[in-house]
Structures are given as C-alpha cells and as structure tokens.
Amino acid sequence: GTTGVLYNITSDQRLKENIVDAPNALDSVNAIKVRSFDWKSDGSHSEYGYIAQELLEVAPEAVHVPAYPEEMMVVDFGKLTPRIIKALQELSAEIEILKQKVN
C-alpha cells in the first residue's frame, strides 16, 4: 500500500496571467543551507534536511509560519521544486556554453 501523502497543485494556464520566465534561481538555491542534524524527539539522525527558520530567509514561499509562535514551522518541499528545476536549467545552459568553448 501507499504510505505517503498524495496531492496535486492546480497549475492550469487558464488560471494564470502575466506569465514570464522566472528570474535567476541558481544564486538562491546555492544560498539554501542543507543541514545534518539529530531530532530531539527520538534522537534519530537526518543526513540531509533544512532548518525552517534558515529557509525562510531564502525561500519564504516554502515555509509555513504558524499563527501562534508555540506551533512549529513547516517546510513545503513541493514549493522548492520549481526553483530547483530553474537552477538546473541555468547550470545546463552554462555547461552547454562551456562545451562550445572547449570544442
């Protein structure tokens, strides 16, 4: 059986306007701190993860800040995907330029 959460995000062009290419994403992706840490609740280790407070500075759209300060911040990893894909596209374009210079 499936143990994850399945969800879809509406992305139909008919619901959008002012559509343009997104700005540079590589710098902001490079600014995201990927951390290793241990969870206080059970001591389990995460080799790769984020700290919501740090991510909030770079990608605020990916962090849910609760109304009450005693509640925990939550990261929506799906909101990071477009930024990461844009950064990969930029790297791919840079690689193509470098290939042309070598040849």
Language-model features, listed with the residues they occupy:
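C-terminal intramolecular chaperone/autoprocessing and neck/assembly modules of extracellular spikes
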Residues: 1-77, 91-103
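A detector for long, heptad-repeat alpha-helical coiled-coil rods in eukaryotic scaffold/tether proteins
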Residues: 81-84
